[in-house]
């Protein structure tokens, strides 16, 4: 029989077989042991093991940039690489900034849909579920950090891992933050049914903070029939259109106080159910006497001649679109339902074939499904992340929804390049959507040109905090900073100075001015330029430093015009929160050098010092 954890702790305390130090360690271990929930055997993952020695960064593939001429075009991002590496890099650029995450992870069906350590996991693998849970768990923990306070995450899944995923999400994202398990009917039937035809999948939905659920989600404007509101009166501007409803009703909820007469224009009285006298036949008015008097006075009640009633009259009340029956302004919507049954999976294949002329990707989700989910979130300027991007449906849906409702949502996609999917499918699909294309019928489809797209690959810098690695990480930080600040236009001149990329780089855009200083010898000259530059905005200055010191003293004369940040320490600080522990002792020991004096050798600064020992691209 299993012992209660507290019983085991008491047994350890009373035992004479252990020293006090051993007892302390055992008790601590027992207290940390999970008593309820999901338990599985952690399986090592090669990409995580690689991160014990290397920090992931992002490097732009500039020739693939698609830059819109529209001034306010959102900048979308496509990252080619393992999503665990990309998530670590995004911890620096987007921690607490992602409003919507949608992911469609492998379902672990055992039919070659899930790869772990470069091998397919089949149905006979005894660690099949443990590998999948280890894989998803690592990514969800980082994803939670990326969510904003009002952030929402949608996760598609089927019966193979739904039960395990729900428990895992309760543990990582918080059971109290569970919103709904949306049921999606993806097809009308299944020929391969095992006794019962499975036609549905699930979309687990969680929010970052349960107390902000009401603010995070939009309402369903289609929850009422707009066509019913077909009449107008003199109150149209303030109340909107209306329809009529009967004022009387019959049923079990009878009350004498609601069975009273209403005076008609001909001087007679009318009771509920068209009666001219008081009778308890179960019928009453829906409104009390005082409210009816108020309704008659303010145009909410309509008395019309009617041949159907013995009195010759009928009494109806008006249901307005924009106010309730007491005159209060309302938004006639309702929460979205957790059932989606009007979008089929077959729609996804049709969209892919329409763009490419062939079904080049078999596992994409329907465009309208993702657009529907994004629209559930009450933020037309949301930043959206999909780190199992596949064919890139989430970006396509984001751009389509922006075009529909005028939003400025930005989307970040992450996918590996297995079978060249990132280059040949994800990128090409969305390039066509932006620039326009000819569909399978030979018709021209106009592009959604008010969108920019930038393409990045994951690169790596050594994790040891050597002088060489620090410099390499600072040099590699430029693309991360552009993403972090949403500023992509690089200028080669700063004031009157012509900049060397190995010394300093300057970016403008999105109402921001970003200066990256890689050689502290240039600070004196750059400070003088800032003094004389005519700019109402502050300069965000990222400056290379061996530690956390951002040269505040050197910038003292322009302190009110700059915001300083030391690199690469700010990158180390962000990434260390999610990176696995190092494999050797002495990890992250500081170098002997503690000041910036002589930190840069002039020759090294000009070369950029991008040696193979400190920075590499995993694809090479």
Regions picked out by a protein language model, each given a short descriptive name:
Residues 67-89, 344, 348-381, 400:
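Glycine-rich adenosyl-nucleotide cofactor-binding module
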Residues 1-102, 108-132, 138, 300, ...:
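DnaQ-like (DEDDh/DEDDy) 3′-5′ exonuclease domain used for proofreading
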Residues 400, 404-620:
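PRPP-dependent phosphoribosyltransferase catalytic core
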Residues 125-129, 133, 150, 160-164, ...:
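Conserved S-adenosyl-L-methionine
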Residues 136, 149-150, 159-223:
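Signature of N6-adenine DNA methyltransferases within the class I
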Residues 18, 23, 209-356, 372:
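Active-site-adjacent helix-turn-beta-strand microarchitecture at beta-sheet edges
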Residues 66-69, 81-84, 88-152, 160, ...:
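SAM-dependent methyltransferase catalytic-core segment centered on the flexible catalytic loop
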């Amino acid at each position: 029989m299993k012992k209660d954890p507290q019983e085991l702790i008491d047994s350890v305390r009373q035992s004479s077989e252990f020293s006090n130090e051993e007892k302390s360690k055992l008790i601590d271990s027992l207290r940390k042991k999970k008593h309820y929930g999901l338990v599985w055997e952690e399986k090592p993952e090669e990409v995580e093991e690689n991160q014990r020695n290397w920090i992931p960064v992002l490097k732009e593939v500039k020739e693939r940039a698609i830059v819109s001429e529209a001034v306010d075009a959102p900048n979308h991002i496509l990252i080619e690489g393992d999503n665990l590496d990309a998530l670590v890099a995004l911890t620096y650029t987007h921690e607490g900034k992602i409003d919507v995450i949608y992911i469609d992870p492998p379902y672990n069906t055992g039919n070659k849909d899930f790869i772990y350590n470069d091998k397919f996991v089949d149905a006979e693998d005894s660690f099949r579920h443990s590998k999948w849970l280890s894989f998803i768990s690592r990514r969800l923990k980082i994803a939670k950090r990326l969510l904003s306070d009002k952030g929402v995450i949608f996760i598609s899944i089927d019966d193979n891992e739904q039960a395990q995923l729900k428990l895992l999400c309760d543990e990582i994202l918080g059971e109290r933050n569970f919103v709904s398990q949306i049921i999606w009917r993806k097809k009308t039937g299944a020929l391969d049914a095992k006794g019962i035809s499975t036609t549905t999948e699930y979309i687990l939905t969680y929010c970052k903070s349960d107390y902000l659920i009401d603010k995070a989600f939009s309402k369903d404007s289609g929850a009422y029939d707009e066509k019913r509101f077909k009449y107008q009166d003199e109150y149209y501007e303030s109340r909107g259109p209306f329809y009529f409803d009967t004022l009387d009703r019959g049923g079990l909820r009878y009350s004498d106080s609601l069975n009273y007469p209403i005076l008609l224009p001909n001087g007679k009285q009318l009771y509920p159910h068209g009666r001219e006298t008081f009778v308890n036949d179960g019928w009453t008015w829906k409104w009390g006497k005082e409210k009816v008097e108020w309704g008659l006075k303010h145009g909410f009640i309509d008395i019309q001649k009617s041949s159907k009633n013995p009195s010759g009259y009928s009494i109806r009340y008006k249901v307005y679109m924009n106010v309730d029956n007491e005159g209060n302004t309302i938004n006639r919507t309702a929460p979205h339902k957790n059932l989606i049954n009007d979008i089929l999976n077959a729609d996804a294949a049709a969209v892919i074939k329409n763009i490419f002329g062939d079904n080049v990707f078999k596992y994409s989700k329907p465009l309208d499904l993702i657009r529907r989910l994004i629209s559930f979130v009450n933020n037309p300027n949301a930043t959206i992340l999909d780190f199992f991007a596949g064919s890139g449906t989430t970006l396509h849906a984001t751009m389509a929804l922006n075009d529909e409702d005028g939003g400025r949502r930005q989307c970040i996609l992450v996918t590996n390049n297995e079978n060249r999917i990132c280059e040949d499918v994800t990128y090409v699909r969305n390039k066509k959507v932006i620039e326009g294309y000819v569909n399978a019928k030979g018709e021209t489809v106009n592009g959604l040109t008010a969108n920019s797209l930038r393409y990045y690959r994951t690169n790596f810098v050594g994790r040891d905090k050597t002088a060489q690695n620090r410099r390499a990480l600072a040099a590699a930080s430029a693309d991360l900073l552009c993403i972090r600040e949403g500023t992509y236009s690089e200028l080669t001149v700063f004031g009157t100075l012509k900049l060397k990329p190995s010394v300093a780089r300057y970016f403008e855009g999105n109402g921001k001015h970003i200066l990256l200083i890689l050689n502290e010898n240039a600070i004196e000259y750059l400070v003088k330029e800032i003094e004389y530059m005519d700019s109402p905005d502050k300069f965000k200055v990222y400056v290379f430093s061996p530690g956390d010191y951002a040269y505040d003293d050197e910038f003292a004369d322009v302190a009110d015009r700059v915001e300083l940040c030391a690199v690469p320490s700010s990158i180390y600080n962000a990434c260390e929160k999610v990176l696995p522990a190092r494999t050797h002792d002495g990890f992250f020991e500081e170098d002997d050098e503690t000041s910036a004096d002589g930190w840069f050798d002039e020759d090294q600064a000009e070369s950029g010092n991008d040696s193979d020992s400190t920075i590499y691209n995993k694809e090479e």
